[in-house]
C-alpha cells in the first residue's frame, strides 16, 4: 500500500502536482485513436451514428471516472481498482484485475515502441536506421523517463498531453473556418450531414441496421478512451489527491465532449462518410489518410501530413510512457497487497519501484523480440490483451457499487466523503451494462449475422479466459469468498495530507 510519508524508503513519493494529474487525465482521453481511426467511425455509422456512439461511451467513461474518483479520493493508492476490488469485493478479483491490467500494459508498451518506429520511418532520412533500432531507442527513452522520480514522468506526460491538446484546439478552429469557407476557398456548411443516407447509416436503410452500425462504433470509441483510468493509479503519488483527483474527474466529461464529439462533428461536416479516405490510417505509412491530415491539407496547410505524423509519434510515446508507469505501479502495489512477490515493492530513494520497473521492462523487451521473430505468436499475444481495458472498467464499476453499499451498511455518513460520485447507483450500473455490451459485441459478425468463426472468436475473446484463469487460480488456492458488506475493509491506511 502506498504511503504519504516521503521518509519511508519502501514507499513511492507523493510528488505529482495537480497540473500533472489534470493533464494526464486529458492525455488519457486523446491519442492515436482520435487522430488515426476516428474517420472509420464516421464511415461505418455515419456522422450521426459516430457522434451518438462517442457520446454514449463518453457518458460511460464519465460514470466510471466518477466512481474511480470517489474511491481514489477516499483511498489514494497506486493499486487503484485492483486494491479496491481486493478490499471491497473479493481478493481474487483484485488479484485477477491487477495481473490482467499489468499484462495489458506490458503488451501495449511493446506494441507502442514498434509503432513509434513506423512513425519515424515516415520521414525518409530516418530510414537510415532499421525499425528494430528505433524501437529499442524509444524503449530505452521510456525506461529512462520512468527510472527517475515521478516528477519526471509527470512533467513528460504534461508536455506530451499539451501538444495533443494544442493540436486538437487548432484542428477545431481550422475546421470551423473551413466549414464556413474562410479557409480552403469553398463554403461547405452542413451538406455532408445529409449526403447519401446520412446522418445515420447501416448495411441498409432500416432502423435496426443503423442501430447495429452505431453499436459497432461503440468498440472503436471504447478503445479510444482506454487509459482514462490512469487517474486512479496516479492518486497513489499525488501531492493532494483529495483536491487533484476530483478536479481531474470533474473535467473528464467536458474534455470528452470538446475533444472527441466536436472533433467527430467537424470531420463529419468536412468529409462525407462515403469518402474512401475515412477508411483510416492504420499505420504511419498511411498518415495522409488521417482525417486530421485531410482537414489540415484541404485548408491549405502543405506540411499537414508531416506535422500530424510528429503529433502521432508523441501520442505513441506518451502511451508507451504511461503504460510503463501504470504497469510498474500496479506490480508494485500488488506486492504491497501480497498479490505479488514482496521483492517487487522495493523502491529507490526517489520513490521509483525499481524491481517492478526492471521486471516489467524485461518482459516488454521479450514481447518485442517475439514480435520480431514470430508474427503469429505476437498476434495472439496482442489479441489476449484486447479486452483487458474493458475488464478493468467492469472492475471499477463493481468495486464502487460494493464500496458505497458497504459504506452505508457500516453506518458511515456519506457527507464525510471528500468526493462523492453523482448518480449512484445508476451511474455504475449503466457503466457496467455498457461495458458488457462492448465486450460481447467485439465479434460483430457473430452478433449481427450469427456467423461463427471459431478462430476469430478465440482470438477476439481470448482475454476473458485468461482473466478467469487468474481469478480461479487465486480463488482455488486461497479459498477466498465474496466479502460481506459489514466485513469490508473501509480503513484509510494511506496517510493523505
Describe every region a protein language model picked out:
Residues 49, 160-163, 230-268, 330, ...:
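Junctions where cytoplasmic loops transition into the N-terminal start of transmembrane alpha-helices
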Residues 40, 53, 62-147, 152, ...:
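Hydrophobic transmembrane alpha-helices that form the core helical bundles
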Residues 163-200, 267-274, 393-410, 437-445, ...:
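Hydrophobic alpha-helical segments and their helix-loop junctions in multi-pass secondary transporters
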Residues 160, 343-352, 393-459, 494-496:
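C-terminal membrane-solvent junction of multi-pass transporters and transport-like membrane proteins
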Residues 1-39, 43-48, 62-66, 78, ...:
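Membrane-interface "cap" regions at the ends of multi-pass membrane proteins
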Residues 83, 122-126, 197-205, 213, ...:
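TM-loop-TM module centered on a large, flexible mid-protein loop between adjacent transmembrane helices
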Residues 56-63, 164-178, 246-277, 357-358, ...:
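Selective recognition of specific alpha-helical transmembrane segments in multi-pass small-molecule
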Residues 132-194, 226, 249-253, 257, ...:
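Membrane-interface loop-to-helix entry segments
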